[in-house]
Curated annotation (Swiss-Prot):
Purpose: Binds to DNA and alters its conformation. May be involved in regulation of gene expression, nucleoid organization and DNA protection.
Main subcellular localisation: cytoplasm
GO cellular component: bacterial nucleoid; cytosol
Annotated InterPro entries: YbaB-like_sf (IPR036894), YbaB/EbfC (IPR004401)
Keyword Transferase: no
Name of the featured protein: Nucleoid-associated protein lhv_0401
A Pfam family of this chain: YbaB_DNA_bd
Keywords: Cytoplasm, DNA-binding
Signal sequence extent: none
Domain of life: Bacteria
Known partners and oligomeric status: Homodimer.
Localization per record: Cytoplasm, Nucleoid
Length: 111
């Protein structure tokens, strides 16, 4: 009868499964806390000359949008559209950057 080698319950560099699960839960809790911190923040994107300002919550919900009356030109609605798009995209980019800075330390080895 062949016998399996006994590694003393160790694997993965000397860490047993119970220790690995404990470490994974700890990391998961830390990531959840980081995400909660991001969600609690507000992020603001501004167009050129601050004519349009878009404010988001950290969970990517548009909270407020302010449009300066100088941005409203009935003869050029495309300009206002471009300003809104610019402000919104900048606000969303801020959320992405904050998320990457905060959670990237946990995920960089996984990709």
């Amino acid at each position: 009868m062949s016998r399996r080698p006994n590694f003393g319950g160790m694997g993965m560099g000397g860490m047993n499964m119970q220790q690995m699960m404990k470490q994974a839960k700890k990391l998961q809790a830390q990531m959840a806390q980081e995400q909660e911190n991001i969600t609690a923040q507000e992020f603001t994107g501004k167009s050129a000359d601050d004519l349009v300002v878009a404010t988001f919550t950290g969970d990517r919900k548009l909270k407020d949008i302010k449009i300066d009356k100088e941005a409203i030109d009935p003869d050029d609605p495309d300009m206002l559209q471009d300003l809104v798009i610019d402000a919104v995209n900048k606000g969303l980019s801020q959320i992405d950057e904050a998320t990457q800075a905060s959670l990237g330390k946990y995920t960089k080895g996984l990709m």
